[in-house]
Amino acid sequence: SCQKWMWTCDQKRPCCEDMVCKLWCKIIK
């Protein structure tokens, strides 16, 4: 399952497409 609203992401729980966590992922990395 993918993450929808978490601020962190990893290979085990990747962000869902077009979700908030994906934006945070890019910002943090």
Swiss-Prot record:
<dbReference type="GO" id="GO:0090729">
    <property type="term" value="F:toxin activity"/>
</dbReference>
<comment type="similarity">
    <text>Belongs to the phrixotoxin family.</text>
</comment>
<dbReference type="GO" id="GO:0005576">
    <property type="term" value="C:extracellular region"/>
</dbReference>
<keyword id="KW-0528">Neurotoxin</keyword>
<comment type="function">
    <text>Inhibits mammalian and insect voltage-gated sodium and potassium voltage-gated channels. Inhibits the mammalian sodium channels rNav1.2/SCN2A, rNav1.3/SCN3A, rNav1.4/SCN4A, hNav1.5/SCN5A, mNav1.6/SCN8A (IC(50)=156.39 nM), hNav1.8/SCN10A, the arachnid sodium channel VdNav (IC(50)=124.05 nM), as well as the potassium channels Kv11.1/KCNH2/ERG1 (IC(50)=3.7 uM) and rKv4.3/KCND3. In vivo, is lethal on insects (tested on flies M.domestica). When tested on mice, it shows very low toxicity, causing reversible paralyzes at the first hour after intracerebroventricular injection.</text>
</comment>
<keyword id="KW-0738">Voltage-gated sodium channel impairing toxin</keyword>
<keyword id="KW-1015">Disulfide bond</keyword>
<feature type="disulfide bond">
    <location>
        <begin position="9"/>
        <end position="21"/>
    </location>
</feature>
<feature type="disulfide bond">
    <location>
        <begin position="15"/>
        <end position="25"/>
    </location>
</feature>
<dbReference type="GO" id="GO:0015459">
    <property type="term" value="F:potassium channel regulator activity"/>
</dbReference>
<keyword id="KW-0632">Potassium channel impairing toxin</keyword>
<feature type="disulfide bond">
    <location>
        <begin position="2"/>
        <end position="16"/>
    </location>
</feature>
<dbReference type="GO" id="GO:0017080">
    <property type="term" value="F:sodium channel regulator activity"/>
</dbReference>
<protein>
    <recommendedName>
        <fullName>Beta/kappa-theraphotoxin-Gi1a</fullName>
    </recommendedName>
</protein>
<keyword id="KW-0800">Toxin</keyword>
<keyword id="KW-0964">Secreted</keyword>
<keyword id="KW-0960">Knottin</keyword>
<keyword id="KW-0872">Ion channel impairing toxin</keyword>
<keyword id="KW-1220">Voltage-gated potassium channel impairing toxin</keyword>
